[in-house]
């Protein structure tokens, strides 16, 4: 009998010794629960509820305003007659339903419900432990050596003081392994073997269970804490850290709950943290033993052209679009970076070849120019996705192929889900018989080929990577000789030997790259600037600003009229256009100094010898450049005559317009790219062309070739109509 009395005494001595050792550092993940927003402890299943089949199961309901309030009560079990394992938030009735069970429990079934969201406490459904496993509430009931656990409420064969009533909130239920005091070794239990009092259980660390391939772009596991133990912030929450990665904006990135993800091409998955002082950290996810990507995740490798966004490009082009050589990926000079071959083993970062390791718009590289960190390799041609077997004639309005992916790699969404949007920008009833499934089509007679809607709110639609059939000469614009003006886009150039201008140029935009002027642009709507693709050497939009209402490129004397706006999105023009529509973070305020310029009508032409003007802050040919906006006067030249001036080396097509200088040596140069060729007709000024990098700078008897805005007018109007913009 003395043995049974001595064991509790020894256990009490052990407990007292443990209490003396308690004041040690507790990891953030296990010691900061009071600071946490408890909604992060739950796995969310949208549009789902639980229906109890067993009538004996209890449910508690109450009116609440938010799911966060439901989570707080469930976590604390405040006012609940049971241990809460899950809850459902009824969004329509603003009501919470708390459950002592979850979707894994018997006597319960899942059911779809548009107004419901199901939240299940992760601790009850997780099959691994974090840290010491203090929060583990799974159902493992066997020790490491295979002995069955003794129930916590039983004193046979071992007496103990770890009673469920003494450890409320520790879930000492049944005979499940637990670690109520957070001791070293992880969850444990008293055993059913009289010879072995207690033993730890063999429950793996979550970091051992989870694994990723490559850099984890396709990782969709359940890791929800960082490598230092910090709990991740939910992707659908903006506290404590505001961010852009909202699940509804990026439906293909797997932004479920607060699980680690890699949406932006980092070396490995990461997350925002609940620590207000630590914005984000990487997650400790090991590489899978079979470090090969699934077939659905592997981009098609190409060497001569790019497909989609060029993530599979493995060619040897090693300069950016303007000829600047690329920096070696394994070098940190002149630009330091973490895009090294060691960090991105699956991305073929050899030598200094153009690559797209982070899912950017197209292949790129760091440059050897210390002043230009990054540049796109946009000179690499796009592949025909169907290798010549799938093509369209004319503008593709009769295309009936089976391609269902956009040029940027997004999967097309079903046409029948987008008919309301389609009716907003066409004035006739589309032929529904042609709009099969989610195949690329051209129901609105778009001049630039088949397209489709996407599931991405930021890119509601885009063109498909289908080429015109070889030898097809069907014009995509009819009545090209009609004397009406059309729409435009711009590129960056500098006006050489122009005269200063001040009046009626409120639509001129100075695009700034790291606070220095790099390109011109035209304000065509309060939230949209038309400019050139070559104006964006960096992929980071935070590097850019738009200055409006200025005359001096440095802003001197323009303080009262200058507006400085951030850039929120770049929408690239149809294939080969070199155009970009730049969306501003907030609308420009139209006043005496800032105004918009009109677009021409689609497909129109302007008569030869019409006097037009180009504007810009680029290279002037003057030693002491004063930084003022300049204008140079040009006249429209026919395509045939323009080709003669270029000694037959240039053949202009329907997407280009030519203009020669009235004054020898005048014209656009570097720094003016993206700016407008402005013409007037019927007392209306409009942007007819966009300045793009040409063949030399203001060369005598060498007219300039511009992007013809009229050819792309419908595309511009379609973007403005269908893309969401911020409200003023």
Swiss-Prot record:
GO CC terms, sorted: extracellular region; extracellular space; membrane; platelet alpha granule lumen
Disulfide bonds: 70-96, 74-84, 128-206, 149-189, 177-201, 211-288, 232-271, 260-283, 305-383, 326-365, 354-377, 391-469, 412-452, 440-464, 487-604, 519-535, 612-679, 642-658, 669-697
Gene Ontology molecular functions: chemoattractant activity; growth factor activity; identical protein binding; signaling receptor binding
Stored SMART domains: KR, PAN_AP, Tryp_SPc
Post-translational modification: The single-chain precursor undergoes proteolytic processing by TMPRSS13 resulting in an active two-chain form. The single-chain precursor undergoes proteolytic processing by HGFAC resulting in an active two-chain form.
Ranges in coiled-coil conformation: none
InterPro entries hit by this protein: Hepatocyte_GF, HGF/MST1, Kringle, Kringle-like, Kringle_CS, Kringle_sf, Pan_app, Peptidase_S1_PA
Segments traversing the membrane: none
GO BP field: cell chemotaxis; cell morphogenesis; cellular response to hepatocyte growth factor stimulus; epithelial cell proliferation; epithelial to mesenchymal transition; hepatocyte growth factor receptor signaling pathway; liver development; mitotic cell cycle
Signal peptide: 1-31
Residues annotated as domain PAN: 37-123
Pfam families with a match to the protein in the record: Kringle (PF00051), PAN_1 (PF00024), Trypsin (PF00089)
Source organism superkingdom: Eukaryota
Residue ranges occupied by any Peptidase S1 domain in the UniProt entry: 495-721
Keywords of this entry: Deafness, Disulfide bond, Glycoprotein, Growth factor, Kringle, Non-syndromic deafness, Pyrrolidone carboxylic acid, Repeat, Serine protease homolog, Signal
Glycan-bearing residues: 294, 402, 476, 566, 653
Connected disease: Deafness, autosomal recessive, 39: A form of profound prelingual sensorineural hearing loss. Sensorineural deafness results from damage to the neural receptors of the inner ear, the nerve pathways to the brain, or the area of the brain that receives sound information.
Subunit structure: Dimer of an alpha chain and a beta chain linked by a disulfide bond. Interacts with SRPX2; the interaction increases HGF mitogenic activity.
UniProt similarity note: Belongs to the peptidase S1 family. Plasminogen subfamily.
Official protein name in the record: Hepatocyte growth factor
Species annotation: Homo sapiens (Human)
């Amino acid at each position: 009998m003395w043995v049974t009395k001595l064991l509790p005494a020894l256990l009490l001595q052990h407990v007292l010794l443990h209490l003396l050792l308690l004041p040690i550092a507790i990891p953030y993940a296990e010691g900061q629960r009071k600071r946490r927003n408890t909604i992060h402890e739950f796995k969310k299943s949208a549009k789902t509820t639980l229906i109890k089949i067993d009538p004996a199961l209890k449910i508690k309901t109450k009116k609440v305003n938010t799911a966060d309030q439901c989570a707080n009560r469930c976590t604390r079990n405040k006012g609940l007659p049971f241990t809460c394992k899950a809850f459902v938030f009824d969004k329509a009735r603003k009501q919470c339903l708390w459950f002592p069970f979850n979707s894994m429990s018997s006597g319960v079934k899942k059911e779809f419900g548009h107004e419901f969201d199901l939240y299940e406490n992760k601790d009850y459904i997780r099959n691994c432990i974090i840290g010491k496993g203090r929060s583990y509430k799974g159902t493992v009931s066997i020790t490491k050596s295979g002995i069955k656990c003794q129930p916590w409420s039983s004193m046979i064969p071992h007496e103990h003081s770890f009673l469920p009533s003494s450890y409320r909130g520790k879930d000492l239920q049944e005979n499940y392994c637990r670690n109520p005091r957070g001791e070293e070794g992880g969850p444990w239990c008293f055993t059913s073997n009289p010879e072995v009092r207690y033993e730890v259980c063999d429950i793996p660390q979550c970091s051992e269970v989870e694994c990723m391939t490559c850099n984890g772009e396709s990782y969709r596991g359940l890791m929800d804490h960082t490598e230092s133990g910090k709990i991740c912030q939910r992707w659908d929450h903006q506290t404590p850290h505001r961010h852009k990665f909202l699940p509804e904006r990026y439906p293909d990135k797997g932004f479920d709950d607060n699980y680690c993800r890699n949406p932006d091409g980092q070396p490995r998955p990461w997350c925002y943290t609940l620590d207000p002082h630590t914005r984000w950290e990487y997650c400790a996810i090991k590489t899978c033993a079979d470090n090969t990507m699934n077939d659905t995740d592997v981009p098609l490798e190409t060497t001569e052209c790019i497909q989609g966004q060029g993530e599979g490009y493995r060619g040897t082009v090693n300069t950016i679009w303007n000829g600047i050589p690329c920096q070696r990926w394994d070098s940190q000079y002149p630009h330091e970076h973490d895009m090294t071959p060691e960090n991105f083993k699956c991305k073929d970062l050899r030598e200094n070849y153009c690559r797209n390791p982070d899912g950017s718009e197209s292949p790129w590289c760091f440059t050897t120019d210390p002043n230009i960190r990054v540049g796109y390799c946009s000179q690499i041609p796009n592949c025909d996705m169907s290798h010549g077997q799938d093509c369209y004639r004319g503008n593709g309005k009769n295309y009936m192929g089976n391609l269902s992916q956009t040029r940027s790699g997004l999967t097309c969404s079903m046409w029948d889900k987008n008919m309301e949007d389609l009716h907003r920008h066409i004035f006739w009833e589309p032929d529904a018989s042609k709009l099969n499934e989610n195949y690329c089509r051209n129901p609105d007679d778009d001049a630039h080929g088949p397209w489709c809607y996407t599931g991405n709110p930021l890119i509601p639609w885009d063109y498909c990577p289908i080429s015109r059939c070889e030898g097809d000469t069907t014009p995509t614009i009819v009545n090209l000789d009609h004397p009406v003006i059309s729409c435009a886009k711009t590129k960056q150039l500098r006006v050489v030997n122009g005269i200063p201008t001040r009046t009626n140029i409120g639509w001129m935009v100075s695009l700034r790259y790291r606070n220095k002027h790099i390109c011109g642009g035209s304000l065509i709507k309060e939230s949209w600037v038309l400019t050139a693709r070559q104006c964006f050497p960096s992929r980071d939009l935070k590097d850019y600003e738009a200055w409006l209402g200025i005359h001096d490129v440095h802003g001197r004397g323009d303080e009262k009229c200058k507006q400085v706006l951030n850039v929120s999105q770049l929408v690239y023009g149809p294939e080969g256009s070199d155009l970009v529509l730049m969306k501003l973070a907030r609308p420009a305020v139209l006043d005496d100094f800032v105004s918009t310029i009109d677009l021409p009508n689609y497909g129109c032409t302007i008569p030869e010898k019409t006097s037009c003007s180009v504007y810009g802050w680029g290279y002037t040919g003057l030693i002491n450049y004063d930084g003022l906006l300049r204008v140079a006067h040009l006249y429209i030249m026919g395509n045939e005559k323009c080709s003669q001036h270029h000694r037959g080396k240039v053949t202009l097509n329907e997407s280009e317009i030519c203009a020669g200088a009235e004054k020898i040596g005048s014209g656009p140069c570097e720094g003016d790219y993206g700016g407008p060729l402005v013409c007037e007709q019927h007392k209306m000024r409009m942007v007819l062309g966009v300045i793009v990098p040409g063949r030399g700078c203001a060369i005598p008897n060498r007219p300039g070739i511009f992007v013809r805005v009229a050819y792309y007018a419908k595309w511009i109007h379609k973007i403005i109509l269908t893309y969401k913009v911020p409200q003023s």
